[in-house]
Each structure stands twice: as structure tokens, then as C-alpha cells.
């Protein structure tokens, strides 16, 4: 029985994120009609040949692009089963090999500046896999990328901080002027956003925060701000992000994140933790310890930080709920809170924090991970019984540390046990303070002292789109 109501049908839905094996995107194949008939044969290399009276013709391979996937309402939560041609390690290695060859042949017009942006969750996943500390892991991963031909390897902290600050400001504005669009729901998880657009559409979209995810904020910083610092056009930069889930590939491919001015995407390629492991294995590197480390780059015009792998509040998914809770308490009610206490409700993936004074609830926040909890929240909202002001939503159980593309557990270890170890590592990281010199620098030098609201809206915020359900026989489940 489906856990979801109505006519919605999901494939392989549970809270263990695995690739979907079904795709119902209808593809029209143009064929030439022959009066004499034709015969199709499969060649030794797997290609298809059509024999007609006029000779042999090789049939084109059907490919489903990321744009097709985003515009389709067939599958809902998982992008892994789609043929992703532009977001793969093979495509990355191809681009880097071609770039290295262009450098070697002094073909300067063809050379691109390659920048890697690495999130902290993949670093922790790889650190656990290779039994290294997080900072050492990051430096050795950077060394590996530099050996492949990367020009720069940076962390995501500046984008993480900007996303938190913009989210907190958006929450306070909604609380003061637009209560009907509450609870405000976090927007950094592309699996959740994709599900919301395809399943609940215009009902749910006004509740989702418009603040971009850290990946997409970093895309703007690299293609526009860093490009200006380097004196390189944005379309000459090839921007790669390393993320903990496959759905980040879909997010990077949204048309909303394509710059018409620069004629390029903010993020060109997304690879994941498990793909890094596969790349290392493919080149015969069994131990990351054998890779020569390289310092993490810091291209921003502020002092270099003391560390490059940071924790954000209590959540391994960005810390949105706790950070916004504490800020809202101070900003709206002049109450200082050192640490928000999130109590476990029905399960470990559903928690809430309440700010209550003299019996009056001032703020009620929740963290809901996994689609079971997400669906319950949505149904409460539809029934008018959701009394939260903010909900941090992540599609994966336990959040981003347990992303669907993190390195798999060793034999004899369960995913839950591995996630617990990653959470313990995360709690040992230095604590980030989003209000820092680097973030202030972005606002003053790139966003014009934050006075240009149009610029902030364009670069740090986005919009969502309802995707109509296709009426096709391929949707029918028997």
C-alpha cells in the first residue's frame, strides 16, 4: 500500500535512498518509413543498425537529459536512475583531459579555469573511508584534484554562511509581514524541492524558502565574483562541486541556475562522495594517504581561516533550524539562547524546539528528515494542523551526512551505524559563526552593501515551478 494519498504512485519508496529503476519519460524516435520494409539488427558493440533498401543506417541512442528529468513528473524523489550524461565522473575526466591537452598544445582560447568546490559532508565520508582526519582528507583530496588538472579547490563555508543569513532574514520578514506563508520550509535539499514541485505544486511552493542552497550560492560566487577577482570570464570557468547526494546534479541543471548573461550554468558538474572513491579506485589509489596533499585555496580578499571543514550548529545538514531559531528569538523577542534544545518526537528524524514564555508559545521549529516525516508534515499543513513556524526538511534519513551518494558502509556495518560515526565526527569539528569577515566582504564588495535588493534577489534567491502531471499510459501501475 502506498504511504501517500490520492493518485500519486511512487517507485521503490522507502527511507533508504537507492536508484529508481523506472523512467516513464516518453521519447519520440524519428524513423524513416520504408515501402519495402526494414530490418533492425544488434551489432557486437551493442549499437542498433537498420537495414533498408538504401543501405545500413545506425540508429541513434535514446538519451534522457537532466532537463527532461526536471520537466517530467514520472519519478519523484530519485534522480539516480536517469542517464545523466553531463553530470558524471566520465564527463569530468573528459573535460579535464581535454583541458590539459589544450594547455600542452598552447591552445589558450580553449583552456578553461577549473574550480572545485567541496562540501563538508563528502569530506567526512571520505575521512571515515580512509581513516584520516577531516582536514588531512580535504588536503589530500585537493591534491588529487590538482594532479588531475584543477586550478583551484575551495570549501563551501562562505556559501553555507550566506545561505544561513539570507534564510534567517527571510524568516524574520515572513514572521513580521507574511504569516500566511508559514511555516517556512528549508530550501537547500533538491530532493525535497523536486518532490514538492512534482507532487504538491502550487499548494506547497509558497511555503518553501526562496534562499538558494549553498551549492547554488557558491555557483554564483565562482562564476561572477571569483571570475572578477581572477579576471576570467564566467563562461571560461568550469565549476565542479563535490556533494553528498545525486539530486544535487539535478539542482545544478535547473534552468533557474543558467546565466543568460554569461551563457553558462553556475555549476557545470556535480560529483559525489562515492564517485570520488570510484575515481580513486579506478586510478589504482587504494589509500588516500598515498596522495600528495595540497593546501586548500582561499581566493577571497580576507585573511585565510584557521580551518576549512566546519560544523554548522547541531545539524549535519547546514544547521538551518537551530541557527534561525536562535536568531529569531533574539531579533523578534529579545531573548538570547545559547543552544536550542530539539526534542525527539516520533522518531530520531523528527524533532522540535519550542520557545515558550509564561505559557505562550512564541516559536515552534521542527527538523523533519526522510520522506515519511515529510509527508506527515505536508498532510498536517493541508489539514490546517501544522503549527510550526519553520521546518528544516531533508529527503535523506539523518540528513545530508547520510546522503544517497555518500560512501557505503563496510561489510558488517549498517548504514545507521556509519551515520552515527559521521555525526560523531561532525560534532568534533570547529563551530562556524556565519557572521564573519568573509561574508561581510561579499555583501560590501559584491552585493553593494546589501543595499541592492534586486542584486540579492537575483544572486542569492530563486523561484519554484509546479510541474504538471503527465497523462500517459506509462504512469499506470497494475
UniProtKB/Swiss-Prot annotation:
It holds the Pfam family Fe_hyd_lg_C. One of its GO terms (biological process) is iron-sulfur cluster assembly. It comes from the Eukaryota. Keywords: 4Fe-4S, Iron, Iron-sulfur, Metal-binding. The keyword Cytoplasm does not apply. [4Fe-4S] cluster 2 binds at residues 189, 245, 396, 400. Coiled coil: none annotated. Gene3D superfamilies: 3.40.50.1780, Fe-only Hydrogenase (Larger Subunit), Chain L, domain 3 (3.40.950.10). [4Fe-4S] cluster 1 binds at residues 23, 69, 72, 75. SUPFAM superfamilies: Fe-only hydrogenase. GO terms for molecular function: 4 iron, 4 sulfur cluster binding; metal ion binding. Belongs to the NARF family. Component of the cytosolic iron-sulfur (Fe/S) protein assembly machinery. Required for maturation of extramitochondrial Fe/S proteins. PANTHER family: NITRATE, FORMATE, IRON DEHYDROGENASE (PTHR11615). This is Probable cytosolic Fe-S cluster assembly factor AAEL012261.
Amino acid at each position: 500500500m502506498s504511504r501517500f494519498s490520492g493518485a500519486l504512485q511512487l517507485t521503490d519508496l522507502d527511507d533508504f535512498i537507492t536508484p529508481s529503476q523506472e523512467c516513464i519519460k516518453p521519447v519520440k524516435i524519428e524513423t524513416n518509413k520504408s515501402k519495402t520494409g526494414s530490418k533492425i539488427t544488434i551489432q557486437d558493440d551493442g549499437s542498433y543498425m537498420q537495414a533498408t533498401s538504401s543501405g545500413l543506417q545506425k540508429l541513434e541512442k535514446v538519451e534522457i537529459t537532466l532537463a527532461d528529468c526536471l520537466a517530467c513528473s514520472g519519478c519523484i524523489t530519485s534522480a539516480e536512475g536517469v542517464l545523466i550524461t553531463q553530470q558524471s565522473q566520465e564527463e569530468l575526466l573528459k573535460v579535464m583531459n581535454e583541458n590539459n591537452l589544450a594547455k600542452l598544445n598552447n591552445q589558450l582560447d580553449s583552456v578553461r579555469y577549473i574550480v572545485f568546490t567541496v562540501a563538508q559532508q563528502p569530506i567526512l565520508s571520505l575521512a571515515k573511508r580512509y581513516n584520516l582526519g577531516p582536514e588531512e582528507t580535504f588536503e589530500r583530496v585537493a591534491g588529487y584534484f590538482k594532479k588531475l588538472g584543477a586550478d583551484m579547490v575551495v570549501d563551501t563555508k562562505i556559501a553555507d554562511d550566506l545561505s544561513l543569513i539570507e534564510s534567517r532574514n527571510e524568516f524574520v520578514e515572513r514572521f513580521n509581514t507574511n504569516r500566511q506563508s508559514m511555516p517556512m520550509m528549508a530550501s537547500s535539499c533538491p530532493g525535497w524541492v523536486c518532490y514538492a514541485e512534482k507532487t504538491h505544486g502550487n499548494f506547497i511552493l509558497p511555503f518553501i524558502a526562496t534562499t538558494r542552497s549553498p551549492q547554488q550560492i557558491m555557483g554564483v560566487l565562482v562564476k561572477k565574483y571569483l571570475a572578477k577577482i581572477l579576471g576570467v570570464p564566467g563562461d571560461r570557468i568550469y565549476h565542479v562541486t563535490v556533494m553528498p547526494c545525486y539530486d544535487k546534479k539535478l539542482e545544478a541543471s535547473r534552468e533557474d541556475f543558467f546565466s543568460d548573461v554569461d551563457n553558462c550554468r553556475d555549476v557545470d558538474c556535480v560529483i559525489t562522495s562515492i564517485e570520488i572513491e570510484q575515481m580513486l579506485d579506478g586510478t589504482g589509489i587504494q589509500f588516500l594517504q598515498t596522495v600528495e596533499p595540497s593546501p586548500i585555496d582561499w581566493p577571497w580578499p580576507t585573511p585565510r581561516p584557521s580551518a576549512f571543514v566546519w560544523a554548522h550548529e547541531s545539524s549535519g545538514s547546514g544547521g538551518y533550524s537551530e541557527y534561525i531559531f536562535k536568531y529569531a528569538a533574539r531579533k523578534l523577542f529579545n531573548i538570547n539562547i545559547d543552544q536550542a534544545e530539539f526534542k525527539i518526537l516520533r522518531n530520531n528524524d523528527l524533532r522540535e524546539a519550542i520557545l515558550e514564555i509564561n505559557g505562550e508559545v512564541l516559536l515552534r521549529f521542527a527538523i523533519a528528515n526522510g520522506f515519511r516525516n515529510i509527508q506527515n508534515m505536508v498532510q498536517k499543513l493541508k489539514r490546517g494542523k501544522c503549527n510550526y513556524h519553520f521546518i528544516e526538511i531533508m529527503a535523506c534519513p539523518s540528513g545530508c551526512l547520510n546522503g544517497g551518494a555518500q560512501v557505503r558502509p563496510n561489510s558488517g556495518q549498517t548504514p545507521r551505524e556509519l551515520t552515527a560515526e559521521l555525526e560523531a565526527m561532525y560534532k568534533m569539528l570547529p563551530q562556524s559563526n556565519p557572521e564573519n569577515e568573509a561574508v561581510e566582504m561579499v555583501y560590501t564588495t559584491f552585493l553593494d552593501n546589501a543595499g541592492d535588493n534586486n542584486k540579492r534577489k537575483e544572486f542569492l534567491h530563486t523561484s519554484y515551478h509546479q510541474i504538471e502531471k503527465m497523462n500517459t499510459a506509462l504512469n499506470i501501475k497494475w
